[in-house]
Amino acid sequence: MFSALCAAAMVTSVSAQGGKDMLSNGIKYLDVPYVAHTLEADGPEELVINCDEVDCTTLVEYVLAETLTPKLADGDISESAFADNLQKIRYRDGKIDGYTSRLHYIADWINNGVRNGFLQDVTGAMSPDTERLSISYMSSHPQLYKQLANSPENVAKMKKIEQSLSGKEIHYLPKAKLPADGLPWIKDGDIIAITTNTPGLDVAHMGIAFYADSKLLLVHASSTDKKVVVSKVPLS
């Protein structure tokens, strides 16, 4: 699966301790069902929390939100604090202002996390390979998105967002430079976003780095397995 998919990867991290927490929090989701489009509710855009059904992006968002939320004295976390962190992760600068305020493109999602101080761009610091974004997929395929299909206004807003992203330079790690046993600067719990060659799109999949038996694997919500799993083969 990953041999075909992983043309290149973008890696982000939280912190040394945060990475350990990301992995342990991610492992708790193993076997949770994979369900797409859980955020596409009717009515005005609002924060959706559904930890019982996840896709590759919402899995990472829920795990990251839990990791960023301090534990209470009893070892649990505050539901309101979790929701606040989730909103900061999922929406541009943490503000809900309609469908297009949600960070649909992962490059935008990463930039938001770096800008707001809860993510670090590891590939930006460690990999010299770069490319310029060319983003247009959502506005070019509005029929695939419930909130775009019958809303020229949302399509126009999305096109402006895509134009603001296009031309920006990103760092990435080519598949040929990613050995099966990983790299010293990719740590357990790092977020790995796998790029795609689909025109107008930046990322096809994402998950959480996990080293096992000296191999770099991924904790991810798999559309093939229909649940959260640890990948059976290395990312290389």
Predicted regions and their residues:
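Short alpha-helix capping/helix-loop boundary micro-motifs
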Residues: 171-182, 196
